[in-house]
Amino acid sequence: MADLARLTALIEPEAKALGFELVRVKMMPSEAGDGGQALQIMAEDPATGQLLIEQCAELSRKVSDVIDAAEESGEVLIEGAYHLEVSSPGIDRPLTRPKDFADWAGHEAKVSLVEKIDGHRNMRGILLGIDGETVTIADNRAGEVSFALEQIHSAKLVLTDKLIAATQPLDADGAEEVLEDKEEKADD
């Protein structure tokens, strides 16, 4: 178990000090294959909507330091071992903040609701935007549906050609080395 509210309160000032905005702080199963858990932190540079690898590394160091300091003073933020994962939200990013629903209006999204509306819990269609705390989507099956932000269990963009065109990568430096490393590990 983790105190996500306290973790967010510790992490957000560190992200802001670097000029970044938090997109999500979440505990999830680790991708390390060890059956453990991971503290996933997604952040973005508001100017680009992305983070470079160097920016992720810088935020990771800051977050590690602030969590270590809190735990050394006796706080229990996360029970048990965990991995820290800091990343950019990616192209098919989660939609977690009101501004996400405004910024990505016109793009296809998948939304899972806490409770059914008009017989549907899962929706997929064009995000029409947000008005106050009410999100509207043109669902492929149910038509235009509106619901409160608090009714959303999860939401994310769907990878489409339109979305790819709207989110060009900032920097591909080092990408070939990463691919080569993966190929070498696969050959081992």
From Swiss-Prot:
Q: Where does it live in the cell? A: Cytoplasm
Q: What is its main location?
A: cytoplasm
For this protein, the record's InterPro entries field holds: Ribosome_maturation_RimP, RimP_C, RimP_C_sf, RimP_N, RimP_N_sf
| Keyword entries, A-Z | Cytoplasm, Ribosome biogenesis
The regions listed as transmembrane in this protein's record are: none
BP terms from Gene Ontology:
ribosomal small subunit assembly; translation
Highest taxon in the source lineage: Bacteria
> Per its UniProt record, what HAMAP family does this chain match?
RimP
Write out the similarity annotation.
Belongs to the RimP family.
Function (record text): Required for maturation of 30S ribosomal subunits.
Protein name, as recorded: Ribosome maturation factor RimP
Originating species = Erythrobacter litoralis (strain HTCC2594)
